[in-house]
């Protein structure tokens, strides 16, 4: 029966491998896939999205990854063993707490300490979850008709070399979840018909070829969760019919060219979650029938270029979660029948479309980043289907993001243009400060232009983004947008720091001569723009070191929090955000705290303390909102960068929310905080409105200097705070004792 099963499986393998080539499908453009037997083609984004876009449901068929032999094996095995049993018991002798049905006996959780005596015609014996610790000599010798034995969860520590003597008809043996430390040579020598041997979750540290002596018909060997550090020199020497081997979650450190040399029948090989560091080039050369290979979660850093050259029938390959440093361009060139390829958590710096082109039957691929999916336009299902920003359909995958990018861009541009216009029309006493504010608004306007551009390209690629994703991220417009966003961000940060320090000197040291003149201020502002330009332009100077610095995501912003990013890109991004920007943020926070403390101290020293309470509250409120807006903008970025340093996995959606919602906060709020809400602006606006409403009846006469009220634009208290200060009280002298 098991030989028949083996023949069926091999037939299924070859038929399944050729199935796709026999199907006639319409020719579709790159990135599009057929709707079954219809002439209609749809892009990848419309396949397996839960919606019948084809009209015949073909776009929602075969969405699950059923390649490999798990499904085929389960189906065939299920059909062979599907037998309906009656409730009648054919056993005359068995323990009281056991359940009998025909010739099968289940003694689960029966508190047994040894194999019980039962009728010799038993065919299935289940002794799971008992207290059996030893299997002595000939313990099953009376039960020559046994076909299945289940001994899981017993903590068996000792198995006699002759424990299974005489079980010539045994087909399935479960010894998983026990305390077996070794397999003695010849322990299975009488089990010539055994097809399944399951030894999962045992502390077995070593096995040899002689451990499996006699297993001529073994089809399935599972040793998951053991403590193996090495495999026998030739694993299949005593198991010529071995078809499926599962050695997951062990401590295997190496495999050699001879390990699977005699495993001609092997179709499934699982070796995930081990400690394999290198796989020799000829390791799998004899596995001509291999259909599924899993090498995931090992320590493999390098793969020989011809490692898979003999695996012509391989349909499923899993290499995910390995610290691979390089993937050869022709690594998968011979895998013509491959249908599923898993490369999750693997950085491929030399990725190209040619690397995957030979795999014509590939239907499922799993890659590290959504960006990589643009290199496999011929694959129907590519995961991840989004990077949190973009999807296969749209540059901005989230509907909220699509709307918000326009709203925030509009607020940012209109607010800053309004401030520039108003500041140009209204004459202020402090012209240098007004100039600084207008320059700040220019920098913030660039962020609005960046967001508008992202919105425009989102509309341009709507519904077909994946088709153009690679071209877009490598394009000049994308790089220019990234440059523009970085320039805006850095110039804005440096300008805010400059303005903060300028006011810090005015408030904390009111009697010093540390003041910048108009020319000095102009030089400082020009220098800030030059520095910001250089910071944003440096990645263009060495593309071999920085890579495509601005083209790592659809919005072209260089947050770079992924561990596997190019070292140059990631290091430079860290230098910008955790170097320049974090330092600037700390300077701003400390300066405002010091300024508030200085104002508070000065107020307490005046004679009219109560008159200053309301003013202090106003100052405190405005200082709070200035610092709070900076915190909203930068703290999320700092947290993300610090978490990336700690190697914490960060969801891809983070970038989109930071770029659309958090980073533009300062650009959108700066006009409000520094101009539109100030008393200076309000009063000047009222004056302009009055001029348009009525003609002046009389001219205001000049008053004496001591009683005059002077309008000041940020001249004494804070950045963005304007107030009327009587000149006589503006210099707050200490109260004499």
Curated annotation (Swiss-Prot):
It is a multi-pass membrane protein. InterPro entries: GPCR_Rhodpsn, GPCR_Rhodpsn_7TM, LDL_receptor-like_sf, LDLR_class-A_CS, LDrepeatLR_classA_rpt, Leu-rich_rpt, Leu-rich_rpt_typical-subtyp, LRR_dom_sf. The chain crosses the membrane at residues 400-420, 439-459, 479-501, 521-541, 576-596, 623-643, 654-674. The keyword Metal-binding does not apply. Disulfide bonds join 28-41, 35-54, 48-63, 478-556. Gene3D superfamilies: Low-density Lipoprotein Receptor (4.10.400.10), Rhodopsin 7-helix transmembrane proteins (1.20.1070.10), Ribonuclease Inhibitor (3.80.10.10). The keyword Glycoprotein applies. Keywords: Cell membrane, Disulfide bond, G-protein coupled receptor, Glycoprotein, Leucine-rich repeat, Membrane, Receptor, Repeat, Transducer, Transmembrane, Transmembrane helix. Residues 421-438, 502-520, 597-622, 675-737 are cytoplasmic. It holds the Pfam family LRR_8. Residues 1-399, 460-478, 542-575, 644-653 are extracellular. Glycans are attached at residues 37, 121, 257, 318, 350, 361. One of its GO terms (biological process) is male gonad development. LRR repeats lie at residues 121-142, 145-166, 169-190, 193-214, 217-238, 241-262, 265-286, 289-310, 313-334, 337-358. GO terms for molecular function: G protein-coupled receptor activity; peptide hormone binding; protein-hormone receptor activity. Expressed in embryonic and adult gonads of males and females, as well in male gubernarculum. Expressed also in brain. Not detected in kidney, spleen and heart. Residues 27-64 form the LDL-receptor class A domain. It is found in: Cell membrane. GO terms for cellular component: plasma membrane. Belongs to the G-protein coupled receptor 1 family. Receptor for relaxin. The activity of this receptor is mediated by G proteins leading to stimulation of adenylate cyclase and an increase of cAMP. May also be a receptor for Leydig insulin-like peptide (INSL3). It is linked to Defects in Rxfp2 seems to be a cause of impaired testicular descent (known as cryptorchidism). This is Relaxin receptor 2. It comes from Mus musculus (Mouse). The gene is Rxfp2.
């Amino acid at each position: 029966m098991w030989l028949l099963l083996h023949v069926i499986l091999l037939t299924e393998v070859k038929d399944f491998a050729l199935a796709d080539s026999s199907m006639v499908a319409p020719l579709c453009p790159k990135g599009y896939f057929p709707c079954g037997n219809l002439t209609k083609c749809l892009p990848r984004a419309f396949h397996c999205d839960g919606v019948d876009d084809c009209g015949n449901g073909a776009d929602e068929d075969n969405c699950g990854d059923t390649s490999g032999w798990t499904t085929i094996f389960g189906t065939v095995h299920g059909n062979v063993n599907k037998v309906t049993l009656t409730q009648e018991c054919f056993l005359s002798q068995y323990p009281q707490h056991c359940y009998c049905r025909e010739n099968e006996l289940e003694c689960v959780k029966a508190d047994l300490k040894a194999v019980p005596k039962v009728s010799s015609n038993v065919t299935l014996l289940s002794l799971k979850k008992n207290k059996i610790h030893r299997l002595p000599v000939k313990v099953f010798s009376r039960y020559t008709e046994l076909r299945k034995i289940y001994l899981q969860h017993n903590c068996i520590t000792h198995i006699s070399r002759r424990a299974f003597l005489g079980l010539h008809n045994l087909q399935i043996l479960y010894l998983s979840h026990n305390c077996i430390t070794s397999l003695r040579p010849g322990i299975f020598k009488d089990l010539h018909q055994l097809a399944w041997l399951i030894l999962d979750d045992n502390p077995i540290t070593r096995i040899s070829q002689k451990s499996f002596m006699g297993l001529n018909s073994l089809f399935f060997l599972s040793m998951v969760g053991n403590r193996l550090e090495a495999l026998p020199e030739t694993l299949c020497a005593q198991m010529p019919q071995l078809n499926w081997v599962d050695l997951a979650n062990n401590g295997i450190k190496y495999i050699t060219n001879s390990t699977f040399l005699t495993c001609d029948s092997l179709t499934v090989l699982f070796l995930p979650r081990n400690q394999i560091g290198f796989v020799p080039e000829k390791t799998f050369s004899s596995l001509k029938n291999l259909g599924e290979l899993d090498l995931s979660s090992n320590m493999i850093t390098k793969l020989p270029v011809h490692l898979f050259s003999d695996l012509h029938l391989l349909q499923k390959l899993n290499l995910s979660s390995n610290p691979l440093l390089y993937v050869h361009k022709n690594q998968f060139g011979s895998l013509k029948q491959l249908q599923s390829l898993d490369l999750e958590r693997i950085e491929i710096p030399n990725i190209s479309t040619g690397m995957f082109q030979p795999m014509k039957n590939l239907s499922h691929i799993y890659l590290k980043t959504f960006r990589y999916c643009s290199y496999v336009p011929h694959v129907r299902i590519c995961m991840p289907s989004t990077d949190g920003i973009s999807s296969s359909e749209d540059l901005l995958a989230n509907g909220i993001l699509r709307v918000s990018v326009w709203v925030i861009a509009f607020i940012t541009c209109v607010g800053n243009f309004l401030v520039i216009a108003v500041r140009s029309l209204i004459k202020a006493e402090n012209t240098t400060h007004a100039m600084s504010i207008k320059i700040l608004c220019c920098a913030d306007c660039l962020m609005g232009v960046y967001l508008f551009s992202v919105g425009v390209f989102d509309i341009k690629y709507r519904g077909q983004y994946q088709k153009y994703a690679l071209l877009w991220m490598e394009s000049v417009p994308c790089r220019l947008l990234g440059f523009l966003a970085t320039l805006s961000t850095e110039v804005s940060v440096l300008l805010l720091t400059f303005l903060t320090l300028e006011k810090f000197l005015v408030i904390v040291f009111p009697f010093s001569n540390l003041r910048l003149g108009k020319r000095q201020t102009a030089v400082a502002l020009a220098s800030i723009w030059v520095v910001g330009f250089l910071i944003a332009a440096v990645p263009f100077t060495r593309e071999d070191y920085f890579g495509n610095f601005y083209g790592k995501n659809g919005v072209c912003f260089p947050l770079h929090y992924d561990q596997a990013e190019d070292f140059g890109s990631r290091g430079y991004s860290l230098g910008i955000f955790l170097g320049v920007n974090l330092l600037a943020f700390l300077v701003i926070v400390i300066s405002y705290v010091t300024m508030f403390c200085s104002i508070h101290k000065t107020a307490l020293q005046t004679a009219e303390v109560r008159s200053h309470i309301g003013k202090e509250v106003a100052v405190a409120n405005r200082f709070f909102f200035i610092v709070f807006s900076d915190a909203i903008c930068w703290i999320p970025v700092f947290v993300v960068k610090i978490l990336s340093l700690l190697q914490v996995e960060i969801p891809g959606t983070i970038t989109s929310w930071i770029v659309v919602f958090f980073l533009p906060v300062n650009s959108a709020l700066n006009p409000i905080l520094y101009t539109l809400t100030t008393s200076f602006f309000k009063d000047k606006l009222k004056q302009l409105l009055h001029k348009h409403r009525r003609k002046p009846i009389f001219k205001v006469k000049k008053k004496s200097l001591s009683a005059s009220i002077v309008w000041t634009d940020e001249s004494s208290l804070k950045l963005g705070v304007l107030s009327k200060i009587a000149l006589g009280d503006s210099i707050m002298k200490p109260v004499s004792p």
